[in-house]
Amino acid sequence: MTIAHKDFLPSDWHEDDSASEAASRNGLDPMMDAVRTLLVGVGEDPERNGLERTPKRVAEALKFLTKGYGQSLEELLNGAIFDLGHDELVLVRDIDLFSMCEHHMLPFIGRAHVGYIPDQKVVGLSKLARIVEMYARRLQVQERLTRQIAEALQEVLQPRGVAVVIEASHMCMVMRGVQKPNSWTVTSSMVGVFKESQSTRQEFLDLIHHKATF
């Protein structure tokens, strides 16, 4: 079947006035126009039933998926750093993460394990997950994401060491390219004592693979 499409200009597309005004206020118009162009490029009709609101939905989704660009460490932590005199390993593992590969803008999905050995100062546990989220909600490569999380903790806490491991499945390897759905990519970033001491590093690695008994 051959489907004929006309050439679309931004002025050709119409939405509900209130939705259009809201999109304009949120700065979505250029993104929506780009989505319409992409739809035409793949052979679709942006005005057909089912696609009329797709440009706005995609633009809003992309804004959410990249909201980390608008966040900062200072705002995220909001003063939740405490001087408790603690100097043993702190670990939060299995932090779910969702990010987007910067090469194909396809998702990669996985989990992060974040640990550090304090030099007196600790951060609220939920903040570790929020730091992961902030850097994951950007266009990323997994190697850089892993390093950025470690560097952020090192910056705000000045601990004796930081360890981050990320395990993720990349849709750019699952849905296209080599199409290997069972492959997982594992990256690590070790700072301070985790890099210098094999026993400290091994303790962290053993704990992230230890099965919970509750």
Swiss-Prot record:
Q: Where are the transmembrane segments?
A: none
Which EC class, in a word? hydrolase
Reactions catalysed, as given in the entry:
GTP + H2O = 7,8-dihydroneopterin 3'-triphosphate + formate + H(+)
* Keyword annotations from UniProtKB, A to Z: GTP-binding, Hydrolase, Metal-binding, Nucleotide-binding, One-carbon metabolism, Zinc
Q: Name one Pfam family in it.
A: GTP_cyclohydroI
Any one cellular component term from GO for this entry?
cytoplasm
Listed binding positions for Zn(2+) are 101, 104, 172
Question: Can the keyword Ribonucleoprotein be found in this entry's annotation?
Answer: no
Pathway per its UniProt entry is: Cofactor biosynthesis; 7,8-dihydroneopterin triphosphate biosynthesis; 7,8-dihydroneopterin triphosphate from GTP: step 1/1
Q: What biological-process GO terms show up in the record?
A: one-carbon metabolic process; tetrahydrobiopterin biosynthetic process; tetrahydrofolate biosynthetic process
The EC number(s) this enzyme carries: 3.5.4.16
Which GO MF terms are attached to this record? GTP binding; GTP cyclohydrolase I activity; zinc ion binding
User: Which InterPro entries does this chain map to?
Assistant: GTP-CH-I_C/QueF (IPR043133), GTP-CH-I_N (IPR043134), GTP_CycHdrlase_I (IPR001474), GTP_CycHdrlase_I_CS (IPR018234), GTP_CycHdrlase_I_dom (IPR020602)
Concerning CDD domains, the annotation shows: GTP_cyclohydro1
Quaternary structure (record): Toroid-shaped homodecamer, composed of two pentamers of five dimers.
Under the heading HAMAP family, the entry gives:
FolE
- Which family does the record claim for this protein? Belongs to the GTP cyclohydrolase I family.
Task: List the PANTHER family.
Answer: GTP CYCLOHYDROLASE 1 (PTHR11109:SF7), GTP CYCLOHYDROLASE I (PTHR11109)
List the protein's name: GTP cyclohydrolase 1
What's the name of its gene? folE
